[in-house]
């Protein structure tokens, strides 16, 4: 509880449990390490703990994947950075406070107007922009998710995608669709 969650980070209760398990195993070993080393160790621990649970949950619903696609491959290949660069080239990003932001409010407002919503109705939604790259240089989960979906459509050639969303992703869908629109992908 002494560590604050990043504003744009995952805030589910299970993250506290995972952090405690990591601390029980590793202790203070990573306290004095650089942020990347600490991040990589936590990510690897989280994957080894959570992927088997996710597979078991999906199995209960009869869902089986032939291949698991890891977010880390998008970062390692530079595809997240490439996707953010594509959004920037289209004029959909700006820098503020050392971070790179997606013009989410502008994109969603444009889509809502095209769907027949009035400016007054759109104003009531209090749409906000999203951080793609934090001031510390790390890309956000949202940036990686945009890259992942771009990869599905633009690289792997999917024409239909079925997403299984967690209950905490209800606001994510329209924002992700907006990012796909900004990239010229449906």
Question: Where in the sequence are the language-model features?
Answer:
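NTP-dependent nucleotidyl-transfer catalytic core
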Residues: 1-186
